[in-house]
Amino acid sequence: MLERFSKSYRIINKEKFVEKLINFSVDQDYFILLNSNNNSDKYDLLCGYGVKSFIKSSENSLKKLDNFFELKKDWLFGYMAYDLKNEIEVLNDDNIDFINMPNLYFFQPEIVWFVKGKIVTGLSFEKDLIDNDWKKFNEISKKEKTKNSSIVKLNLRNSKSEYINKVNKIKERIFRGDCYEMNFCFDLFSEYDEINPYDTYVKLNNYTKSPMSSFLKVN
């Protein structure tokens, strides 16, 4: 495994730095930002972009990922989709897949940035790339490349009565002792509207301050 060069810098405002990173991502094919916001964690923020290598799979995915990691032994960013469960257990669900994403997608970034407190550290196989990209970040002005999204009308996939019925079934299972906690996700969609994902992420993150905020762009 090749070692990465590292260099650290100081920032004044993390939120402004996040906006610069999101603006920078417009010109990147592979980009991920993981933001802890104000929650205590090992890193306040992790970011990776560019691609040295990648893996995507919808069959025997975990074994392929394990082999990929053993080969690279480096930073890998990506996701495991909900339907990966169907590779582990014999499961059949009738959920409609409107996105058709692979069950697993990970990439090895050309450069990694992490933030802890007021210190930003860059990691790269090319020493000059860290300084060059840092200069690019500081040349980016707010909303330089991203534009505001138009107002989008969101629709629920299920009716209110269907939603209440599912919540009641979840409560029954909790009362029965099948589980003590359950995440219930539901679909909000818009069929014909276009949004600016960069501007939308910044606005949503500033509003929610989610402890597991993420922005991912692949290919």
Q: What residue ranges belong to the model's regions?
A:
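Extended alpha-helical targeting/anchoring segments
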Residues: 1-219
